[in-house]
């Protein structure tokens, strides 16, 4: 039987290279991947942080596709992972007489962050085309003195073409587990399902097609005062925005939600929050990445 779906794998192992840039240690990596994954050229910022864009060469996902993405940060690593384009999930429902209900395309993500390491995973948005079915799972293990920043931006349908999600479904589960010497402690769990019903519900998305999450889990001993000041600054920024934004304080970090009509506005909001997080951590100011949409760069 001829297979018509992708089964792609990507493994990335980042580690600190003592051969430094001046007086700054540089994070480098080893990788192993299969199609449709392709790694673009990595660069480094002034803190030695490895900046790596990942490309999905197939141009999108269809029902039955299975991707596995595994990331490991060794001790004393700093990494910014992103993607070079939006992830497109094409329609599956009603496309096949054999399986008229369609089948989900799936992505499983496994991330491990060891001592004194910091991962920023900022992929571009996922676009669920009409009748697209997508299920993503993230399992993140993080040490007590490390941090993890993650953004997830979802667009339901191509609203510029008058398209909605129709019978499509987006599912996501994020689990963040804190490692210590004695036991593993659940840090954060987030489970989301978006469909036409939630898109149309007044108490849901209320016909606004763009939904975003920003999750930042910091070191266990990070200053609570700094987190409170960060939240205060972000709330001031919210007052200047016409979008629906909310923020919650986690035990160690923050959770931000975005709801609106513009992916560009969502990216702008998350970029501004990212700058605030970098500042409160004492890291260098982030820069707009060249693989991100050109029109956005004029606004930052």
Swiss-Prot record:
Q: Record's Gene Ontology CC terms? A: cytoplasm
Q: Which keywords describe this protein according to UniProt?
A: Chaperone, Cytoplasm, Nickel insertion
* Compartment(s) of residence: Cytoplasm
**Molecular function terms in GO for this entry?**
nickel cation binding
Superkingdom of origin: Bacteria
**Function per UniProt:** Required for maturation of urease via the functional incorporation of the urease nickel metallocenter.
- Belongs to which family? Belongs to the UreD family.
Q: Which PANTHER family match?
A: UREASE ACCESSORY PROTEIN D
Summarize the subunit comment.
UreD, UreF and UreG form a complex that acts as a GTP-hydrolysis-dependent molecular chaperone, activating the urease apoprotein by helping to assemble the nickel containing metallocenter of UreC. The UreE protein probably delivers the nickel.
Return the protein name.
Answer: Urease accessory protein UreD
> What organism does this protein naturally occur in?
Prochlorococcus marinus (strain MIT 9312)
């Amino acid at each position: 039987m001829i297979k018509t779906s992708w089964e792609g794998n990507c493994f990335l192992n980042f580690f600190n290279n003592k051969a430094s840039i001046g007086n700054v240690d540089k994070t480098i990596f080893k990788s192993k991947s299969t199609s449709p994954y392709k790694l673009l050229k990595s660069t480094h910022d002034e803190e030695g942080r490895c900046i790596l864009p990942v490309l999905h060469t197939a141009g999108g996902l269809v029902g039955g596709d299975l991707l596995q993405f595994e990331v490991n940060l060794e001790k004393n690593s700093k990494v910014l992972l992103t993607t070079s384009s939006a992830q497109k999930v094409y329609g599956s429902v009603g496309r096949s007489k054999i399986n008229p209900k369609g089948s989900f395309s799936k992505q499983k993500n496994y991330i491990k962050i060891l001592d004194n390491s910091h991962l920023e995973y900022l992929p571009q948005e996922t676009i669920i085309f009409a009748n697209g079915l997508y299920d993503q799972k993230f399992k993140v293990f993080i040490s007590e003195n490390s941090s993890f920043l993650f953004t997830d931006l979802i667009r339901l349908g191509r609203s510029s073409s008058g398209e909605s999600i129709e019978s499509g479904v987006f599912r996501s589960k994020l689990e963040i587990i804190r490692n210590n010497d004695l036991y593993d402690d659940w840090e954060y769990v987030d489970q989301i399902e978006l469909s036409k019903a939630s898109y149309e519900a007044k108490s849901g998305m209320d016909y606004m097609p763009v939904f975003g999450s920003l999750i930042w889990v910091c070191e266990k001993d990070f200053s609570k005062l700094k987190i409170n000041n960060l939240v205060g600054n972000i709330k001031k920024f919210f007052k200047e925005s016409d979008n629906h934004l909310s923020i919650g304080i986690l035990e160690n970090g923050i959770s931000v939600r975005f709801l609106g009509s513009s992916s560009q506005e969502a990216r702008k909001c998350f970029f501004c929050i990212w700058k605030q997080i970098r500042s409160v951590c004492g890291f260098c100011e982030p820069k707009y990445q060249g693989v991100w949409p050109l029109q956005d760069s004029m606004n930052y």
